[in-house]
Structures are given as structure tokens and as C-alpha cells.
Amino acid sequence: RNLAREATHSPTRHPAAGMLAENEKGPTMRIVIKVGTSTLAHPTGRLNIQRIELLCKVMSDLKNAGHQIILVSSGAIAMGFGKLNLPERPKDVPTKQASAAVGQCELMYTYDKLFTEYNHTVAQLLITRPDITGGGQQRENFHVTLERLLELGALPIINENDTISTEEISIGDNDTLSAMVAASIRADLLILLSDIDGLYDSDPHKNPDARLIPVVERLDDHIRALAGGSGSSLGTGGMVTKLQAAQIATEAGCEMVIANGHHPAALYDIAAGQPVGTRFLAGRKDL
């Protein structure tokens, strides 16, 4: 993995950021938040209780402020192999799918318990590629159900259905999934929380003078060349998938931010348009 460093953010507003907080949409937004495995779990695969509690508290507060929150959560496989006492993340498909089946139960139990403390109702949606990219009834059902859940005030929690997904119907990573969801429901903002702080102009592991890029106005070959390898040992994503997600989201008119999930309270600053991580500016939404 390239391009990682401890998260920092300034209290000053970047002149190109914060458009969503100040434009004609008003103070509330439709926000998709993707949480990576490294944010939710310790390296052992066991749940990082302190972090997930704070994460749910902040998302509940943002929802109380009037924002619509959709959570795309990784972590099922990692929590499953931890609970099954496997020594490391499984590599064969049957064990991955078995771990997902066990871990998804623990994941949703935890979310339901924590969000209930703040009087919010959660809903689980486990999907595969045809549910969101197909042109048939599956896609329509997913979209209608998700919109209805938001109308009813629920907090949808989405994950790929790893227990039944095959290569043919797999989306592959939740960076891409979250961007597809954001595009599908015309979200205003997509936030990717992971163990990386954003996009750097060079590898900060090798270059101590590497600088975080606060704003990307356009995804071009130079920006894509900055992407490094794959993600952490617990997850499946990396900077490459995050830039692919940025392409999907921004083309649909949705801004995207990459930030470090080790600091969940940073969600407040991100929603307010403060310069946290790297913000990818969106194209204009179709009318």
C-alpha cells in the first residue's frame, strides 16, 4: 500500500472545498459513508469497539442534524475469521464465504445495538452487482427499497453479499460499491474512510516530504499515476480502487472525500466542507 500517513486536518477552510456546505442545497445532504475493514477491526480481526462506538455516535449526530446517512460497511469477512478463531484472513472462496456469513451477523448486531442507543433504526441490504448495475427488476427493487428506507427515516447499512457472490456477480470491493450506491441515489457526498489519509504527491513511506493533495478538480493520468498498491491485509481495497470510485461518483455529480477512519470525529469537518483528507470535486448533476 502506498500513500498512507497519520491523518491531519487544518481548522482553516480550503478555498476550493466546502462547496456543498455553502451552496443552494442548504445545510443538509444525502451522504454515503464507506467504512473499511481496517477502521472497524483490530489486526486480529476482532472488533475495534472504541472506534465503532464513536463512528456510530458521530453518524447518529449527523443524522440528527438532518443529513440522510447511508453506510456501506466492510468487515464481515474479517470479523468472521476472528470469531471463528482462524489464524489469518482466509484465501479460499468457501472459507471466505463462511467467514462472511458469521461476521455479517456480528457486524449487524453491533450496528443495531449502537445505533439504537441513539434512537436510530438500521436496515441491512446485502447486494450483488446485478442489484445495482443491471437493467432489470433487481436494480429497480434495490433503488425503490433504498429510497423508501430513507423516507421512513431508517439508516441503511449496505454490504456486498459475500456469502453468495461469485466472480461473475461480485462487485469486488466496497470502494466501488459505495460509489455505485452514491451515483444510483444521486448523493451529494461520498466519504471513504480507511487507514489512509488521502492522496499524496508521492509515497510518504519513502519520501518524508510527500504532500497530501487536499483537492482534486479533475481525474487525469497524472492523478491516476499517484495510486499505489492494494490495501491492508484485512481489506480488499487500495488507492487504485478509491480513484476508480472517485471517477464513478464525480461523474454522477457527487463529491468524494478520502479520509482516515481512525478519527471518526473528522466526519463533522468533512460534512462542513473543511479540508480533511483529499476532496474530489464533482461534475454538474444532470437535471
Predicted regions and their residues:
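C-terminal catalytic "cap/lid" subdomain
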Residues: K25-L287
